[in-house]
Amino acid sequence: MNPHLPQVPGVDGPLDINVVYPTRGALVGSRDSNFVFGSVGSGLAALKIDGHLVPVWPNGAFLGWVPNPPADSQWYELVAYTLSDTARLRYPVRTRAGIGPRPPYTPEVTTFSPSVDAILRNDSLDRTVSDTDDVIIGRPSPAGDYEWFLFPGTVVRLLEYRDDMARVQLDPGQDIWVDRRDVKVSTVRKVRKVRPKKKTRTHLRVVHASMSASHASVDLNVAVASAPAYIVSEGDRDITLTLYNTIASGASARLVPITDPLIQSATQSRESDRTIYHFALTRPVYGYETLYEHGTVKLRIRRPPIVDPAEPLRGMTIVVDPGHPPIGATGPTGLWEPVPTLAVGLKVRDLLEARGVHVVMTRTTAAPVALGDRPIIARRADANAFVSIHLNADADGQNPFRDNGTGTYYFHPQSKLLAQTVLNALVPELGLRDRGVFYQNLAVCRPTWFPAVLAEGLFIIMPDQEAAIRTPEYQDAYARGVVNGLEKFFATFAK
């Protein structure tokens, strides 16, 4: 029993075995053991799964870590019993042992030799202004992390199709993988797989590069003939824009810098087929965005907010995202994740508004909001920060008795500090194990204009933690942790 959690209420009803996970007939993804959870109707009952005694909480919830069923009996045998009653359930599942080894996998490959010109999602070619929400995702390998966020209409060289992915070349030194549906070519023909022949490419000419400033950002403006492939990389106090397959020469293409308190230095250089713009900043990177508008690539480097040390949150715009629906994890007694995350999110809103924050909610009802719409809401609100509220669950094969607690997630480096301050504030409020801060490629953490994090306050599949988050007092604790973490984060920007 965790003394930091509210007491689990007692339930003593008729025995009724209800398995929540795995779902009936589902394929169990683990190799030899897995968790099974649900409820039995009475906290006074004992429960065995395939002869293994598993714990039952006072509210009748159970969670067991048991061996997978053997190949010749693809089910769990559950027996719940009290002094006066017994209930049995044969619960069917599937395991790897039961379905046999996977057949060898051979990908479907189409190789182009020589490579051919391709346009990334050319349905956007008629537009002269790009939206940062409409990008093509690039990876270093078919299953790799997202590293490139390319403009629609970018011209690349198509090297091969592999199943639903396409390998394209940004310049002779850089191949990446994109979704095959994002690639449009005039002619597609299958040829035998050979090494692509080298082909002379026409470089995009950088016509002019200059800088400008506003109250919100310092902007790099690079005039080019068409949308180039690019990548933005960042350190703690520096940011670099690399334009692939470009050439900048002559006085007209030199960077015209400006004097600005955010910029320590600004340089332009050339490396092989690339034009590189590097900015050393006087303060840590807070946010940025990359646009292609009217023939100009814009890198906007966001200024950190002006913060009152006495009231660090006042005047900020913060987007609160109660995680899910349409999907979400479910606990042993049937509590669905979107229900308590909304309750916590609304409490976060109220606490933030009391501190002078303009709060934008991604949802205030049970109606589903698409995952991709949530960061769009935040960017269009010009948010100063984004926090998504979730409840965790283990993957098949992970023992939840060993792996549970509180953790936070980020994707871009400028969000790591926010993830840490929120975690530091949540752990004492919730009283659970500190799992740490994790780098992970999550959709709601990918925006670059503002720090964005996702909080997994607890594990809803743990019976005592599921019972706790049903209570208003524990929802309050989660909300306080989020708000205190946000306040600590913005206090670091106070002068």
Regions found by a protein language model. Give the residues of each.
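Short linear recognition/processing motifs and adjacent strand/loop elements at protein termini
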Residues: 2-31, 43-46, 53-319, 326, ...
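A short beta-strand segment in extracellular, disulfide-stabilized domains
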Residues: 33-37
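Extracytoplasmic/secreted envelope proteins and their assembly/folding machinery
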Residues: 75, 342-349, 372-375, 416-423, ...
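Soluble non-cytosolic domains of exported or imported proteins
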Residues: 140, 144, 150, 335-343, ...
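Sec-exported extracytoplasmic/periplasmic mature domains
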Residues: 161, 346-357, 379-383, 414, ...
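Active-site histidine-acidic residue metal-binding/catalytic motifs
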Residues: 300-385, 395-398, 402-404, 494
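Solvent-exposed loop/turn segments at secondary-structure junctions
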Residues: 325-327, 365-369, 391-397, 413-416, ...
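Active-site-adjacent mobile loop/cap segments within catalytic or ligand-binding domains
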Residues: 385-388, 395, 407-410, 436-495
